Curated annotation (Swiss-Prot):
Its EC number is 3.1.-.-. It is found in: Mitochondrion. Its cofactor is Mg(2+); [4Fe-4S] cluster. The lineage of its organism: Eukaryota, Fungi, Dikarya, Ascomycota, Saccharomycotina. It holds the Pfam family Exo5. Mg(2+) binds at D270, D320. This is Exonuclease V, mitochondrial. Present with 1420 molecules/cell in log phase SD medium. Single strand DNA specific 5' exonuclease involved in mitochondrial DNA replication and recombination. Releases dinucleotides as main products of catalysis. Has the capacity to slide across 5'double-stranded DNA or 5'RNA sequences and resumes cutting two nucleotides downstream of the double-stranded-to-single-stranded junction or RNA-to-DNA junction, respectively. Keywords: 4Fe-4S, DNA-binding, Exonuclease, Hydrolase, Iron, Iron-sulfur, Magnesium, Metal-binding, Mitochondrion, Nuclease, Transit peptide.
Length: 585
């Protein structure tokens, strides 16, 4: 039934024993001339004259009609070229299906370890997975998803060319900018400040990215309780999953050397909402704290001491934001279920990070170390200076490090002293050359339209010296452990998916946290990532092929689809024969 396909030089894929495919594409990326409809033409198999051989195909190739045809438009586009390259890459790695030559195998390549080591560790040099990677294994077709994972660079380039993907990113960014305008203001200030002072910010990209994520998360979560409007967006979180048994890790040891079998799962929460526990109204400035002359440390101490009261009246809802090309929620249940699970992971992570501040402190340090970062290395002084100038709460807080005072975090205070030094003495030179006054962004009050204020470098001269306690990632991990402990204790069991069409939030789904469902999903996803099972293609029904395969990049070269569609055709013929025979009796 599955005889070897013959492909003519123009891409027609011909199965001599069965039928001719039109509007198809070969595995090497050759595109086939489109017809108005994708017909299948039966070739009578009981008539030898009806079977096309190599000579017949050669005659077809030389018909004048084919000499005047031009390649399809898709092959001339950047998207078409990337797609051809991706298909060739996946074919080379997975190989052809030995039972169905010319089509890609639907089993993991032999000789490779498992997707986690093949893709994350060896290919991307990342010793971690993401929540998205766990949730997208089963949200659509697991086969397609892992073809994409193994060709991640090309797949991402193709995704970035798609209009809807770009539109979705813009919506997420506009929501973040609306809630946290200080981020763009900080970037603009830093660009101008470095240019005017002729300073450079020589900092490792991975360190810079992590530092920004940690700094922004602390600042946004603190603002959630102070001057914020009851919302925080783009908050990092993480947890661990066991490499051996695929279970989410609930309790961590404090040393990374004892947790090597646990893989980090990282995520970014789209939206947190602080609301009244009883009437569900959004809470603005729930802690009723005046932030003037305050510091991160003072605010965190206040929140921790009043946590019981905060918890009795308030809760925090975790939301995931999904953008749509039409104002309708997905019709496929597995897609909605995947979004629900994604939000459940975030809930679990915050619960994990709110059990014990010392454990959470070490958890963040392990996260940084797994990224190859030195948690004891002093952070770039210029980076810290920009934080000091633009964030008074941070500036007031790090005075403790400047003077060698404790920050009221036992794990950090016992761990902070080291041989490294943190020296900002060089910034004294700025006072003798160039401008010393700058407009910096400020957090706006509702009754104020001012978005900047003028500061002088001379006002911060006390920082331009050698600090008694070096400023390292450990300081940020300590403050993160405190604010995550507070937020985690307030996280609601109600979770939410927000659907956006353009900038309109047209529908929300609220659902309960289900730890049993989450545990089952985590284990099943871990098994495929860590090599405990093979990929699960979609159930081979015609409805599924029509639904899942319609826009799939691999639809023309997928052996699973091809083989099972042939079986469905044969089954249809058998049923037709049975019906005819029954009607003749």
């Amino acid at each position: 039934m599955l005889g070897r396909a013959l492909i003519n030089k123009y891409g027609f894929l011909i199965h001599p024993r069965r039928f001719v495919h039109l509007n198809d594409k070969s595995l090497d990326g050759t595109f086939i001339l489109p017809s108005k409809k994708n017909h299948m033409y039966d070739v009578p198999t009981n008539d030898p004259s009806g079977i096309l051989n190599a000579s017949d195909i050669d005659r077809i190739n030389n018909l004048p009609f084919f000499d005047n045809t031009s390649p399809t438009k898709e092959t001339n586009t950047k998207e078409g070229a990337l797609l051809s390259e991706k298909l060739a890459s996946v074919k080379e790695l997975f190989g052809e299906d030995p039972e169905n030559p010319s089509f890609i195998n639907y089993r993991f390549p032999r000789g490779l370890e498992n997707p986690y080591f093949d893709i994350q560790v060896n290919q991307l040099k990342k010793k971690r997975l993401s929540v998205t990677q766990l949730c997208t294994t089963q949200n659509w077709c697991e086969l397609r998803n892992f073809y994409d994972f193994y060709s991640q660079n090309l797949s991402n380039q193709l995704l970035n060319l798609k209009f809807q993907v770009q539109k979705g990113k813009k919506i997420h960014k506009s929501l973040e900018d609306e809630t946290h305008p200080e981020l763009n203001q900080y970037k603009s200030f830093t660009h101008n400040f470095l240019a005017l002072t002729k300073l450079s910010m020589d900092i490792d990209n991975d360190m810079d990215a992590l530092l920004d994520n940690w700094f922004n998360s602390i600042n946004r979560l603190v603002s959630l309780f102070t001057k914020g409007d009851g919302h925080a967006r783009e908050i990092v979180c993480h947890g661990f999953i066991n490499l051996e048994d695929g279970k989410l890790v609930e309790h961590l040891l404090n040393s990374d050397s004892k947790t090597k079998e646990n893989v980090i799962i990282s995520g970014v929460i789209d939206h947190l909402t602080l609301r009244n526990r009883h009437n569900h109204q959004v809470q603005k400035g729930a802690a009723h704290l005046d932030t003037e002359y305050q510091s991160w440390g003072n605010i965190l101490t206040n929140l921790l001491s009043n946590l019981k009261e905060l918890k009795s009246n308030n809760e925090i809802v975790i939301s995931d934001i999904k953008t749509r090309s039409v104002p309708k929620i997905p019709s496929i249940e597995s897609v909605i279920e995947s979004s629900k699970l994604q939000t459940m992971y975030y809930k679990f992570f915050f619960s994990h990070l709110s059990q014990d501040m010392t454990q959470t402190y070490h958890s963040f340090l392990i996260n940084a170390q797994r990224r190859g970062l030195d948690v004891d290395a002093p952070i770039n002084p210029t980076k810290i200076l920009t934080f000091i100038l633009t964030n008074p709460l941070f500036a007031n807080d790090v005075k403790n490090l400047l003077y060698g005072l404790p920050i009221n975090h036992s794990a950090f205070d016992n761990d902070a002293k080291g041989s490294n030094t943190f020296d900002m003495t060089a910034f004294n030179d700025l006072l003798d050359r160039g401008p010393t006054s700058f407009n910096v962004p400020i957090e706006q009050d509702e009754d104020s339209s001012e978005s900047t204020k003028c500061v002088s470098l001379r006002d911060y001269g006390h920082f331009y010296t050698k600090w008694k306690t070096p400023l390292t990632l450990k300081y940020f991990a300590a403050r993160l452990s405190q604010i995550y402990f507070i937020v985690g204790n307030l996280v609601s069991n109600d979770l939410m998916i927000e659907y956006y069409y353009h900038n309109d939030n047209f529908h929300n789904i609220i659902f309960p946290y289900d730890p049993l469902k989450l545990g089952t999903h985590a284990h099943d996803s871990a098994m495929v990532w860590f090599g405990g099972r093979d990929m699960h293609p979609i159930e081979p029904t015609q409805k599924n092929f029509n639904t899942y395969c319609k826009f799939c990049d691999y639809r023309h070269v997928c052996s699973w689809k091809n083989k099972n569609e042939l079986k469905l055709i044969d089954l249809g013929k058998e049923l037709k024969k049975i019906i005819l025979e029954s009607s003749m009796k």
